[in-house]
Amino acid sequence: MSNLLSVCDIKDEVLDILELAKNFKEGKMEEKPLAGKSLAMIFQKSSTRTRVSFDVGMYQLGGQALFLSSSELQMGRGEPIPDTAKVLSRFVDGIMIRAIEHDDVVELAKYSDVPVISGLTNLEHPCQALADMLTIQEHLGKLEGKKLCFVGDGNNVCNSLLLMAPLVGMDMSVACPEGYEPNEDIVNMAKKLAEEHNKEITISSDLKVALDNVDVVYTDVWVSMGDEKEAEQRQKDFAPYQVNSNLMSLANDGAIFMHCLPAIRGQEVSGEVIDGPQSVVFDEAENRLHAQKAVLYHFLK
């Protein structure tokens, strides 16, 4: 039995899952392949895209999704994670969890007898990265040979993109202020994968260096859930990294803009960019549904 806790868990299947997602989007798959299957969805953090896309995805696949807020579960009152995992495994065919701590998801998967899918942790967001690659493929025609630059905080989304880019044939750079680099272990793993696939990973505080020959400019909020106490300092540190028309001009002609949403216009991105012709953020949001249907099919079928 396999789980999706990290991009590394699907490093040999990424392209197959993306092909599945494309087929689901184009209506080429069998109808209701997960009829009679159920998915428990545990949420420790609030969500719009993750909750709706998994819920609708299971419905469209013929199965049922059960929304479980951690505050409503005994887990929220101190029941050990292993006990929760063992009990849920007796009732459902899979567990999706959106958690605060990555270690909690690892522990849940360790004791679960059914596949566990990460809907986001403080370390990674693999389903988002799959949706992102599907979106890039649609808009640029291919992934191989393209380059993505993540601008801003080296967060969970950035971590998953770093791991996935070389697997699909892309180079990747990260433009961030010093002190906000992505997780060191993730960067080392990404560089190892890049070496294996003859690709490049670059981390730089210099925008011109990071945005050289870039086809995709990607950003995310400067203040993630849990970082609110640092908000004022973060806004100062990230101000030069706002994705606006000047920054976009450093990328290639025809470059697209991406953001996993929710976005704060006037902070990490200007309104003219996110609402402009280069922005593909709502296609990207929609593709969460198709990518996750592929994930559910892959792990629960």
UniProtKB/Swiss-Prot annotation:
Covalent S-S links between cysteines: none
The pathway to which it is assigned is: Amino-acid biosynthesis; L-arginine biosynthesis; L-arginine from L-ornithine and carbamoyl phosphate: step 1/3
Q: Which GO terms describe its cellular component?
A: cytoplasm
Locate the residues binding carbamoyl phosphate: 47-50, 74, 98, 125-128, 260-261, 288
GO biological process: what's one of them? L-arginine biosynthetic process
User: What are the subcellular locations of this protein?
Assistant: Cytoplasm
- Name of the protein: Ornithine carbamoyltransferase
